[in-house]
Amino acid sequence: VAFLSLTRILKVHYSVDIKLRDSEIKPVDFKFKDYKTWFVDSGLATIMDSKLDLSGIELELKTGFLKVLESREKLKLAKKNRKITRALLVSEAANYDFGIGEAGDLFEALIIYTRVLSGYYDSVYNFNLSTVELNRIKSKGTANP
């Protein structure tokens, strides 16, 4: 009877606590939770105090900030989903290695994990894109990004 052992083929020991290697795709650092804090920290408050008129882009700034917060929440959800499906894949691989799992279940878990991982990378991309867009809107009102 043919027996496929992923641990022997890939030369990697699987466990539920396995750490994935960091990829080059990472979300940017955006620590702000509320608009006022971001507005002051980004230097826009001092510009508002000066004679420059930011009233034309203030709505764009608020909308852009809300998009960043929304995409960050989607990113958090995608990160949780990735962790859950990784655990499913590891358990299916272990079951298959022990001879109690079926090949179909293992490949189905692999397909699910691949789709969820792709969704995670999409979420990272959308989050990074929304922060860049917010920075672009901010730079319209100021001379510096």
Q: Where are these predicted regions, by residue range?
A:
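Juxtamembrane helix-loop transition sites at the ends of transmembrane segments
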Residues: 19, 32, 120-126
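Short, solvent-exposed, mixed-charge loop/turn linkers that connect secondary-structure elements
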Residues: 1-45, 131-145
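Amphipathic alpha-helical coiled-coil segments
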Residues: 2, 46-119, 126-137
